[in-house]
């Protein structure tokens, strides 16, 4: 089976080399659709022997992606964004997956690099070249809607997934979002789509969560609740979207109504989706219980998160705080150190480690941990560095 790689780009000279290099040894052809680059994007694509086409940007990612599909020639299509890379370890299982004569679509697990709360998502980026597969939705473009229509008429096709992380994505790191004004672009495009599809649960979830992140909490809450009402009225529930709605509603309510937030997190965790995708709700549910004083309940949830993903640094840090509160200082220290090993720039874990080491009388190692925490806080211009330094000064420690 031949595999085509498809990507749309504009001014991606910094990210594109890593993206194309990650798929070079896997795919049979590269199709690059440029939407108006003024930097070295096209030259970089040419250096990878990609076939390059141009498209006038029309504020619609689906339109651009569908244009790129016109040029692919392989039996299967793999789609990435320039700020994504394919994980090398997944290549053998990906090759095996596209040999299946029964599958129309293979969903892939994507990891959001630097995301603490919801590090994983499932994306429909590997699919058979079928004349009726098309992208829909102008911002979060996906083929799911067209695949659903195909299955109604060709029910013998199967949908599969690869359970291991296949894609690494760094486009939602704070620096990238700020540099590209991603929030404003996403808001404009999704609001336009919402005006024509006011009760679409998926866009209600995505745009509602975006409103909350931008500080428009009331507007976001209303949209999330609308999405929840809409999806509950559907004959066939989309479990991943229902999870996201409950997860985001839990986040909104967590500050003012912990019981309502807990109900939403519980319902999110109950959805029939890949366990990795539930980590955000499991971790946040644990935070609610910890804040309420239910330390054993919180401990169980953090341990559940680590059973799913032993490399989840935030769960190690949160479990460390819970164990410290339970008086299990040695175990707490071990989890803080694991969190730091997994995420060396984890200032909060260093700070928590310092507090616990001081508690057990290990002053020298404690001060070393505090110095690391302060240095990281200062690198990120966080006011927590000054607060920590002042707190230590009041205790008689001058760092």
Labelled PLM ranges:
Residues 69, 86-215, 219-222:
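Catalytic-site signature of metal-activated, phosphate-bearing donor transferases
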Residues 34-46, 57:
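A conserved acidic beta->alpha catalytic loop
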Residues 213, 254-255, 291, 325, ...:
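Register position in tetratricopeptide repeats
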Residues 201-202, 235, 243, 275-279, ...:
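Helix-start (N-cap) detector for alpha-helical repeat units in TPR-like alpha-solenoids
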Residues 205-209, 244-254, 279-290, 314-325, ...:
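Conserved alpha-helical positions within TPR/SEL1-like repeat arrays
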Residues 193-196, 228-244, 270-279, 378-380:
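Flexible helix-coil transition and linker loops at the boundaries of alpha-helical arrays
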Residues 77:
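Short aromatic/hydrophobic "clamp" motif used to bind/position activated sugar donors
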């Amino acid at each position: 089976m031949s595999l085509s790689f498809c990507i749309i780009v504009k001014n991606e000279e910094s990210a594109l080399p890593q993206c194309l290099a990650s798929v070079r040894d896997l795919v049979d052809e590269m199709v690059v659709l440029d939407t108006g680059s003024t930097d070295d994007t096209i030259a970089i694509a040419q250096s990878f022997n990609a076939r390059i086409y141009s498209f006038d940007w029309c504020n619609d990612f689906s339109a651009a992606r569908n244009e790129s599909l016109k040029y692919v020639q392989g039996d299967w299509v793999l789609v990435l964004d320039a700020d994504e890379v394919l994980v090398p370890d997944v290549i053998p299982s990906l090759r095996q997956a596209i040999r299946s004569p029964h599958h129309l679509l293979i969903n892939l697990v994507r990891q959001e690099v630097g995301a603490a709360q919801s590090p994983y998502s499932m994306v429909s980026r590997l699919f058979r070249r079928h004349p009726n597969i098309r992208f829909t939705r102008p911002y979060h473009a996906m083929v799911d809607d067209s695949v659903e229509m195909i299955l109604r008429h060709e029910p013998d096709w199967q949908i599969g997934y690869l359970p291991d992380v296949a894609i690494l994505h760094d486009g939602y790191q704070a620096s990238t979002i700020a540099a590209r004004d991603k929030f404003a672009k996403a808001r404009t495009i999704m609001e336009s789509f919402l005006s024509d599809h006011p009760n679409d649960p998926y866009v209600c979830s995505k745009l509602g969560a975006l409103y909350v992140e931008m500080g428009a909490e009331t507007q976001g809450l209303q949209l999330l609740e609308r999405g929840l009402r809409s999806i509950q009225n559907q004959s066939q529930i989309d479990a991943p979207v229902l999870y996201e709605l409950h997860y985001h509603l839990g986040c909104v309510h967590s500050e003012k109504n912990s019981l309502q937030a807990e109900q939403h997190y519980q319902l999110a965790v109950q959805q029939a989706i890949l366990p990795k995708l539930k980590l955000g709700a499991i971790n946040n549910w644990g935070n609610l219980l910890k804040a309420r004083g239910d330390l054993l309940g919180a401990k169980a949830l953090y341990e559940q998160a680590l059973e799913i993903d032993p490399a989840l640094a935030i769960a190690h840090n949160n479990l460390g705080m819970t164990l410290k509160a339970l008086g299990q200082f040695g175990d707490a220290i071990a989890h803080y150190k694991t969190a730091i090993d997994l995420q060396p720039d984890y200032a909060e874990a260093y700070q928590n480690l310092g507090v616990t080491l001081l508690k057990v009388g290990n002053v020298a190692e404690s001060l070393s941990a505090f110095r690391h925490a302060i240095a990281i806080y200062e690198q990120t211009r966080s006011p927590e560095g000054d607060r920590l330094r002042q707190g230590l000064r009041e205790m008689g420690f001058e760092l």
